[in-house]
């Protein structure tokens, strides 16, 4: 600017921004940006990096930096009932800068990292279930759990970081993946997007294993969703030695039929001793105990050996690691109570599959793909998941483990408006089936509370040795 060019800073910046960004017809500067604009422009001799979002021709300027190489960051967060996982990414390259996971309480990146980059976070995408979405926004979630199970909202846009007190640029956009029903939330719309079942001609099934087991069935023509209360067992909750899939978690188990000795796969570096057992390990150990006839179809111990013990009440348990073998100096075992809890969790999943398919006059023979998601370990032994009656007894090549699809979907939304639009489209077009009001669901659930099922004809390949 000069005495002959007295255009105000805001207008000068707006004109240059419109010229620099293709498709930009209007520029809006946030209050946070205007407050520091004069000093930043002059410190940088009017050579600045403009950061913001361009939507429908409107550029919302969130920051003006004198550093030409200042990074653009985004956050993707999966808020589960049991676990919260988040990643910090470079929006320009997609490179992950940091990752953190914790029990659902408070999640933090390292203090030094967040202090350096907080003002450069311009988009935050969150995928969580319906209840967690309500709690995050401070909205009453009680109606979600009471008949007729009506949430306050399915979708809510227009929020910024300052609205939620989120550690980011105060004008950073907060995007919630939209909910579908009372118990099918944004974690599933984001997950269904990741699975790509919406882009296939064949029928596929998507299953997210968590405290709420959530399912989506369909193809490019239609999709149906439902949810069942599986409890936290898949994530190690309600299991005496259960834990999340972090260092020290037993994630795979093989048991010798004759000696009853276990071979354990443990999360962590070589030599890592076991601390507890995560979801994938629980599936394995129950399947192996059943395969080797150590437990009955009711989950009760029927064989004796040095790895099988009983408490003063006669309650049996299988010892995966003695106190001397564990990292903590405490015995790691799975009890009959643990097994019963997990049988109920797997029964909820299988009965939900049956009810959803039968509501469409279909059965598992129509499935061309079964995608399984959830943060329960580095993978699932599908053979064992079928053996215990959690997944249908179909060709194992049809199964694929996708990991944390809720987080993957949130990551895609953070980097692409096209992904945001597609997730919104999936949510608006998906039919929601309320299992809690289905009169057949409880009968199906009770029938599935055995290993593998009361109807053995459904699981011809599940045999005991």
Residue ranges and their predicted role:
Residues 1-76, 81, 93, 119-123, ...:
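Nucleotide/phosphate-binding catalytic cleft detector across ATP-hydrolyzing
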Residues 80-81, 86-88, 94-112, 143-158, ...:
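Glycine-rich phosphate-binding loop of actin/hexokinase-like ATP-binding domains
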Residues 119, 188-191, 195, 343-365:
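Phosphate/ATP-binding catalytic cores across multiple sugar-kinase/actin-like superfamilies
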Residues 219-224, 238-239, 358, 362-426:
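Catalytic phosphate/nucleotide-handling subdomain of diverse soluble enzymes
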Residues 283-345:
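Gly/charged contiguous loops adjacent to phosphate- or pyrophosphate-bearing nucleotide/cofactor binding elements
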């Amino acid at each position: 600017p000069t005495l002959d060019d007295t255009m105000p800073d805001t207008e000068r910046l707006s004109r240059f921004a419109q010229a620099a960004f293709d498709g930009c017809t209007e520029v809006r500067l946030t209050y946070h940006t205007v407050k520091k604009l004069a000093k930043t422009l002059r410190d940088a001799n009017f050579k600045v990096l403009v950061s913001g979002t361009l939507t429908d021709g409107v550029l919302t300027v969130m920051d003006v930096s004198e550093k030409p190489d200042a990074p653009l960051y985004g956050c993707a967060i999966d808020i589960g009932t049991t676990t919260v996982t988040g990643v910090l990414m470079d929006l320009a390259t997609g490179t992950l800068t940091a990752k953190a996971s914790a029990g659902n309480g408070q999640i933090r990146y390292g203090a030094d990292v967040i202090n350096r980059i907080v003002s450069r976070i311009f988009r935050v995408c969150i995928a969580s279930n319906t209840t967690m979405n309500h709690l995050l926004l401070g909205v009453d979630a009680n109606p979600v759990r009471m008949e007729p199970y009506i949430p306050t909202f399915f979708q809510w846009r227009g929020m910024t970081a300052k609205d939620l007190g989120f550690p980011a640029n105060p004008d950073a956009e907060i995007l919630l993946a939209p909910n579908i029903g009372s118990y099918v939330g944004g974690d599933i719309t984001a997950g269904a997007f990741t699975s790509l079942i919406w882009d296939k001609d064949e029928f596929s099934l998507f299953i997210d294993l968590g405290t709420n087991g959530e399912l989506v069935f369909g193809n490019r023509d239609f999709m149906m969703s439902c949810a069942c209360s599986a409890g936290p067992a898949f994530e190690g909750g309600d299991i005496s030695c259960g834990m999340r899939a972090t260092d020290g978690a037993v994630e795979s188990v093989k048991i010798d039929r004759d000696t009853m000795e276990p071979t354990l796969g443990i999360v962590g570096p070589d030599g890592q001793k076991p601390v507890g057992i995560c979801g994938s390990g629980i599936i394995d150990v129950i399947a192996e105990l059943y395969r080797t006839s150590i437990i009955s179809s009711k989950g009760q111990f029927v064989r004796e050996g040095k790895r099988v013990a009983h408490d003063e009440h006669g309650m049996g348990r299988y010892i995966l690691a003695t106190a001397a073998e564990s990292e903590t100096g405490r015995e790691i075992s799975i009890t009959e109570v643990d097994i019963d809890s997990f049988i109920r969790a797997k029964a909820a999943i299988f009965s939900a599959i049956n009810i959803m398919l039968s509501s469409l006059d279909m059965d598992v023979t129509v499935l061309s793909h079964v995608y399984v998601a959830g943060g329960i370990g580095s993978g699932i032994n599908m053979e064992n998941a079928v053996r215990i009656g959690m997944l249908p007894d179909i060709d194992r090549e049809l199964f694929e483990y996708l990991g944390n699809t809720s987080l993957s979907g949130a990551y895609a939304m953070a980097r692409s408006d096209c992904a945001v639009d597609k997730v919104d489209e999936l949510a608006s077009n998906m039919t929601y089936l309320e299992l809690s009001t289905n009169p057949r669901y409880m009968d199906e659930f009770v029938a599935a509370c055995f290993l593998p099922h009361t109807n053995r004809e459904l699981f011809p390949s599940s045999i005991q040795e």
